[in-house]
Every structure is written in structure tokens, then in C-alpha cells.
Amino acid sequence: MNYKVLVTDEIDPEGVALLVAEPRISVDEVPTLPKEDLLNRIAEYDAIVGRSATRISADVLEKARKLKVVGRAGVGVDNIAIDTATSLGVAVINAPAGNTIAVVELFFGAVISLLRHIPRADTSMHAGRWDRSALLGSELKGRTLGIVGLGRIGSEVATRARAFGMNVIAYDPYIAPSRFEAVRVQKMESLESVLEQSNILTLHTPLTDETTGMIGKREIARLPQHALVVNMARGGIVDEKALLDALKSKHLFGAVIDAYEKEPLAPDHPLRSMPNVLLTPHIGASTMEAQRNVAVDVCIAVRDALLSGELSRSINVADVGGQWSDIEPALTLARRAAGVGRAILATQGMRVVQRVDVRSGSALTGAKSALLASAARGLLEGTVEQERLNLINARTVAENRGIDLSTTETPTQDNPFSIEVRLSGGMQEIAVAGTAQPGVPPRLTRIGAFHVDVQPRDTLLILTNNDVPGVIGRVGTLLGEAGVNIAEYHQARLAQGGQALAAVSVDGDVSEAIRESLLRLPDVSSAAVVCFNPG
């Protein structure tokens, strides 16, 4: 399959070259497009890669019927309609690590510049003055730096701040305590406790409903007298009016701002007239190295998502809890086990599954959410009118259909790579289990009460029959005469002479006519056909 990618917003050529080098990918590189032009063109592309200048709005996504991936060369994704992308099954991929050092270095450069009055000193020197006595500054050493958001950038700021002899405290309710210990930062239990102790407050969080306006009038009032506020994250985290009032009243010593509520900043914005504010035009990531890094990172991720389906870098897909290559067999197994269960229930007359429960071994604990999404996808494939049903939107689609999704802890299982998918509705239930070790094709090990050992590949026949001589031979003969090649045939029984189950892996498709012929064989009581989609 070949793919078309639209690249815009002047992405670094080193990243674009990685896409161009792939024979299955064709690239159209264009300047930033007006929205109307983007709407007219987007339908023909499988992916778009850009920066913040291009807004990927809900109407753009709805027009993009082929779109699989949106790549953002940078960190912030507030220019992308994430909820719409998720509902449509479009992966959103950013490059959070590529510009880390650029932002960190700008932070220290700007803060030191303000504390040492470097902009004023430079201006006065160029004006022919020698204002040495009026430029008495202050040092970083001994000050308390409060960090809100201890992710990549916050952690790197903390490491370098300690080298300056600063006392570093931080607040981030989503980061494990071990991370605070690793970067040798004092963990604060509330935003208020950080505010009350910070001589310099710096923000390194995404812009979300939770963080919008997070630093307002009340929060600024909690800061010590003559504190410094730094926002190099996203505009809107700091209430600009409240900041301006605190600067005018001299409650704050100053501020360093690189991100604004509305960009570009209006020429007459009152912040521009404040002498104790250092303003930069959102240049946190504006280094040659950072632009190259984020372009390379996002283009690699977009390429891998298109060519191999790897979604580990997607911000709107469930966390896989490890390396994608290690977890991929488990995702495949969960999806295909659900498909097998659905097919068996259909032969029993049940068309509506009400509940999906996934149980997994200890090695897959971190991937539970992704496994559940994959099982939901396997259940729904072929039964819903959804052009892009995948890990990204399968849970939402299932929940919208009233299907209850859950995971169950199974800490005592002997096999750490085991997975069981249990489907139920009304009085009926089926459990399909298997094992999925890294680097090894997954195998089904149990279907209902029957223990089997078969690889779920291409097409799987599940037959129930009486445990009597001749059934296997008749099934094999019928399939052979129909031109269907058997890859594996596993027969299981609960007791001699009772009911048996056959799991037959075959190459290619099995038509409805062949299935009906199987049902007409003596002693065969049911026949289900599961065709596994690639991926």
C-alpha cells in the first residue's frame, strides 16, 4: 500500500528527507496553507506533518477521509482537535523531546538576563551611556526555584538549576515520586505550597482544561514579594491581566514570557510597555538543532505509523506500557481472541455482546488499557460502519454502543505473557485465551473449556463436533477439494466420545458456501469462520 503525506509549515529538510526516502510514501511539501486551501486538499492525504501555524480543526479532520496520522513537529498540540481525531481514529503524534534543551537554555538565558538587567545594559551601551551603577543585579545561587510540571523540560531545568546552587522544589501530581528523587528535587504536595516558597516560578505543563488560567490573581498573590514568574510553556496558563497587575504593583520583581494567550502579541499589548518584563516571540524551540530534532523525530514516527502501524508515539492512543515491538504480539492476540469469541457466540445465536473483560499476565500489566482497546477493536471489526477502527477509537466506539469494557487483575497466573478475553451478553459467555511473548507470533491456548495450541493467522475455522472417528479426515478432504490449504489443525476434547472442538488455521479465505458444506458433514455441530485483518 502506498501513502501520501502533506508537509507544511517549513519542516526541517532533514526530517522531510526521511519520508521522501521511503518508496511507498509520496510527499507534497507546501508553505503554510490558508484554511480553505487545506480543506480543499486534505482529502487526498494519509498523513499531514506541520508545526503550530497550521490548525488541524474538527472540520479539517472530518474532510480528511483517508487521514491516518497528524504529525506535529514540536510539543504543543493545542492547534489540533484531539477529541475529533480520536473519535475518527486518527493518530496524533508530536515530538516532545526534540526541543527540550533549546527551551531549557532559553529559560536560563532569559532569567539571568532579567536578573542582571542585560537588555537594559545593552540598550544603554548602544545609546552611548555608561550606566554601571544603575544596573545592580542579583544571582541565582541561594534562590528557591519552583517548577510546576516535572516532565522532560522541567526535569532538565531542575538539573541545571542545582548546578547554579539553587534550592529546587516542584509540583506535578502526574509524576511518580521516584522521578522527583531521580532529579533530586523536593516534591511538593500542592500548587499552593510551591507558590508560597518560590522566588522564581517556572511553568512546564501542557495547556489543558486543568491548566488554563492555573496561575491567576489568587495564585500570584501567594508568591513571595519580588518573585519572578516565567512562562515558556503555553499561552493561557498564566492570566496575563493578573500578571500585569502584579507587575505594576511591584508585588512581582518581573516576568519572562515566551508564550501568550493570543499570538502574535498585539503591538499595543500592555506587557510590551513594562520595563520589568522580558518578552520573546515564542522562540523556545527556535534553534537550528531543535527544529532539526523535532522534524526528524516526528517524521520517523509518522513513517513508522504508516508503514508498520506503530502507534507508540501517538498521544491519543492507550499507553502500551513498554516497547511497541514487545507488546505488539499481545495487542494482536487480544484483538484476534475477541474476534474468535465473537464468531463463536454468533454461531450460538448471540449477536450483541454486552461486556468485554481482558485479563493479562504480570508482564503485560502496563499495557492493560491498550489490550482492552485492541480487544474492543477485534470485537467490532466487520460489525460496525467505521472506516477507521483502530486502537485509537475502538474503546470510544464500543462504549458508544453500550458495551461495558473492563480489565481484571490476575496476579497468580503462571504465564506472565498470558491474555484472556472474555465476552458476555445475556446468559452466554465465552473466554478465549492465549500467550504472546515478545518476538514470537501469538498462539491461542484455550477456546471456552477446550485447550488448544494454534496460531491465529489469516483465517481460523472453529468447529465443534462429536468425538468419533473420521471427522478430521472428512473435514480435511472437504477443505482440500475446495482448494483450502490447512496450516494447522488442533483437535481438543473434554472427554473421550463427548464433544470436541477443532481449531483449524488455513491459508486464504473460507467462503460461506464452504462453511455450510462443513455443517452438513456427519457429526459436525457448528462451524465459525474468523478472517483476521492485517495489523
Give each language-model segment a name.
Residues 88, 96-144, 152, 156-164, ...:
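Phosphate-binding beta-alpha-beta segment of Rossmann-like dinucleotide-binding domains, i.e.
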Residues 54-61, 173-270:
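Rossmann-like adenosine-cofactor binding region
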Residues 88, 92-93, 189, 226-346, ...:
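Rossmann-like dinucleotide-binding domain for NAD(H)/NADP(H)
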Residues 8, 147-148:
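Conserved N-terminal Rossmann-fold NAD(P)-binding element of oxidoreductases
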Residues 1-45:
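N-terminal glycine-/charge-rich "phosphate-binding" loop or analogous flexible N-terminal tail
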Residues 28, 34, 46-122, 137, ...:
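Phosphate/diphosphate ligand-binding glycine-rich loop within oxidoreductases
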